[in-house]
A protein has these predicted regions:
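Mixed-charge, low-complexity segments
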Residues: 1-157, 172-296
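Short amphipathic alpha-helical face segments that pack within enzyme cores
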Residues: 161-169
Length: 296
């Protein structure tokens, strides 16, 4: 049957996408680019003949520039939690307000959340960090997403499990939310942090999942419950939907058979701009050092 591939950056990504390519094997296939009802790019691929190999390769060149994740405007009526969406907007957001799950553990967590009047930013920061601190992150290779009750009972979850739990919590609290999947790009910092974690020890990228909440005036704002931080320049969205099933990187059907799945991701810095933390390249530093020794 047809294979649906969701590995092209979404139209709304904040990072500048300079180029994108998708290569598929076997080369004898039909491909049609589409957009789903939520504006995400889909590649529909059909193979006219049976094959024992299905290979997908994507190449992406993007400009990563640091931005302030809190740099957005919020309409006056939505600056404090709780707030109500305007009637017309609420109708448009209906799929993102639909409650899919409930249960004693989910209800208990909702009861534990401070729902007194406070700025919406403070509320979202606290809720996002609550999940990050309450759950242990794990790499879970099983397909699908855990139910909220299962996640809260186990107190451990993959990124997609945490993202779905946050979606449901937000909806129960009256806030429209959607499930986002994409690439997470983490670059090794130029200098070590003196007052907190320094981040990754080497450049890294992988598929990731997070949550987006709709704030009047700001639009969709990303929350990453895995890290407890707001989504930044390293979050490259591929697909955002009301439910996780619509955001899977690849979906389709195959005949019963034995199969093996492998995947590999890598990141390369093509060009770097001078910055305060790295004003010179390593070669330039060596030249400066050599000149200094010569002067001495």
């Amino acid at each position: 049957g047809p294979q649906i591939i969701r590995l092209r950056p979404a139209p709304h990504v904040r990072s500048h996408i300079q180029s994108y390519s998708l290569k598929i094997k076997p080369e004898k296939h039909f491909i049609n680019w589409q957009q789903d009802p939520f504006g995400n790019f889909l590649a529909r691929v059909v193979f006219p003949e049976k094959t024992n190999e299905f290979r997908v390769e994507t190449d992406l060149i993007t400009e990563i520039r640091v931005f302030n994740p809190f740099d957005f405007f919020i309409e006056e009526h939505a600056q404090f939690f709780p707030f109500d969406y305007e009637a017309s907007l609420k109708k448009e957001l209906a799929p993102y307000l639909e409650l899919k799950e409930t249960g004693p553990l989910l209800n208990a967590m909702l009861q534990s959340i401070d729902q007194r009047k406070q700025t919406i930013i403070d509320f979202l920061v606290s809720l996002n960090q609550l999940l990050s601190h309450s759950l242990t992150y794990l790499v879970r290779l099983e397909p699908g997403v855990q139910s909220c009750e299962e996640t809260l009972q186990k107190k451990s979850a993959s990124c997609r499990d945490m993202a779905w739990l946050l979606c449901q919590l937000l909806r129960h609290l009256g806030l429209a939310s959607r499930f986002a999947s994409g690439y997470l790009i983490q670059l090794k910092p130029d200098v070590q942090s003196v007052d907190g974690p320094s981040g990754t020890e080497q450049d890294f990228t992988d598929l990731h999942a997070w949550t987006e909440v709709y704030l009047p005036g700001a639009g969709w704002v990303g929350l990453d419950p895995t890290s407890g931080l707001f989504a930044g320049e390293g979050h490259i969205s591929l697909c955002s939907t009301p439910n996780p099933s619509g955001s899977a990187p690849i979906t389709g059907s195959v005949e019963p058979c034995e199969s093996a799945l492998t995947h590999e991701m890598s990141i390369t810095r093509i060009q770097e701009q001078r910055r305060v933390t790295k004003p010179y390249t390593e070669t330039e530093w060596q030249s400066i050092d050599a000149l200094g020794k010569k002067v001495d």
